Amino acid sequence: MIRQEETICAIITPPGTGGVSVIRLSGKDAISIASRVFRKKSGKSLRDAKTNSIQYGHILDSSTGAVLDEVLVGIMKAPHSYTCEDVAEVSCHGGPFITGRILEVFVREGARLAEPGEFTRRAFLNGRIDLAQAEAVIGLINSKTEEGLRSAIWQLEGSISRKINELRDSLTAALASLEAFIDFPEEDIDVAIHDIKGRVHSSIESIDRLIEGYYRWRPFREGIVTAIVGRTNVGKSSLLNLLLGEERAIVTPHPGTTRDIVDGLANVAGLPLRILDTAGLRATEDMVEEEGIRRMYKSIDSSELVLLVIDGSEPLTEWDEELLKRTEGKKKVIIVNKIDKGNVVQDGLSTSSAPVVCTAIIQGEGIDLLRKIIRDTVAGKEKGIAGETIVTNLRHKNALEHSKMELNNFLEALHNKLPLEIQALHLRGALDSLGEITGIVTTEDILDRVFSEFCIGK
C-alpha cells in the first residue's frame, strides 16, 4: 500500500555517469529534509526560499557534517509543483556514487524511496492531471517519432480528456432525464426518450471514430514489423544501415555475409519500422546459411511489410522470382537497387501490384522517394494526426468498447421496453467505462496497473 502522507525521494535522471544528476524530494517534509543537510554561505535556510527559486550551496553528510557535493536546489512549494506538494530538486554532479550518497542522506533524514511512477501518481491524486494525462507522460517518454511525440503532448494537454468529458456530459444529461421518469412515472416520457436516443446514437458515433483512430494510428504508435529480403549481395544490409542511421549489419562485396536476422528500429518519414534484415537467398550447402534462409521465410510470414530488394543491374533470377512469389499477398515495396550500374529488370516488374522504387543505395539515389513510398504503403495518404483526438492507449480503447457495448445494451433494452431501471443501469455502465479513462471512476487495481509501467523517478 502506497502511503501518500510520507515524503518520498528518487533520482529522476537516467542511471550512470553524466554531467548532472537530479534527486527529487516530494511531500510535506521535502523542504525541511533538504534544509537540514543544505548549507549556503549566507546561512539562510531553504525554508525561507521563495517558491520557484534556485538556491546554490552544498549538501552535507548528516552523520559526519562532511561536504558531499556542490549543488543547486530548486524549491517549489505546494500547490505549484509537479506533484502539487512541496518539492525540492537537488542538481548535483552526475556520478552514481555521489547521487547514491545524497539519496541515502535524504532517507536517513526521514524520506522514503519512491515507488515507480509515484510522483506522477501523486500529481493525479492531488488533481493536477487526470489519469489519461498521467498515461501521456509515459507516451511522451517512450515516443520514437514526431507523430508519437505530438500525440503524447496533445494527450498531456487534455485532448482525450476533453473529448471523454464531452461524451460524459451528454450521457449524464441523458441519464438524468431517464431517472427523472423513474421518480415521476406520471410524466410524458416520449419527448424525452427521443432526446435520450439522439444523445446515445451520437455518443456511439463519436466512440466509433475514436476506436477507428486507435487502429488507424497503430503503426505510428507500435511500429510496423518489416522484413528486408532479397537474394545475396543485392544491398539489403546497406538499406538496413541507411534506414537505421548506423552500421548494424556488415556490408561487404561477398555474398552470404548476413546469416542471421538483425533487429532494428527505424524512423521512416515519421513511421517507426521494426526492421528485420535477413540472410540472402541462394543455392547453398552451408547448413548455417540454410538456417538463415529458413528464418528469412519465417520473417516474411510474420512481417506486416516486406521490402524486397532486387539487383537492377542483372536480369531477374529464379531466386528473385521465388521471392516475388513468396511475398504475394503481403504489403510490400519492391526496391530495384544498383541502378547506377544499369536497370535491366524494371520492365519485368511492370505487372506487379506493389510499388517499385529504383535506387542506388550506397550513392544515396532514390532514398527520399523510397521513404515516402514506404510511409504511403503503410499509412495511405494520411498526412499525420493534424490535431485530431487520437486514442493511443489500449486501456482507453478497451474502455471505449465497453462503453459502446453498454450503450447498445441500453438501446436494446429500450426497444424491448424493459424496465427503466435496467435501461438506466446500462447508461451508468457506459458512463463508468468512460470515467475509467480519465480516472473519475477508478480503483486501486487500475491505478496500480497504470503506474506500474512508469520508471522510478517519474
Regions found by a protein language model. Name each.
Residues I54-K77, G256-T284, S299-L305:
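Switch I (G2) and immediately adjacent beta-strands of P-loop GTPase domains
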Residues R112, P272-R274, P355:
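Conserved beta-strand segments of alpha/beta enzyme cores
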Residues L244, A279-G280, E304, D311-G312, ...:
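Short glycine-/small-residue-rich Rossmann-like dinucleotide-binding loops
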Residues E289-S313:
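Inter-motif core of Ras-like GTPase G domains
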Residues M1-R150, W154, G158, V333:
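A glycine-rich (often HGG/GG-containing) alpha/beta subdomain
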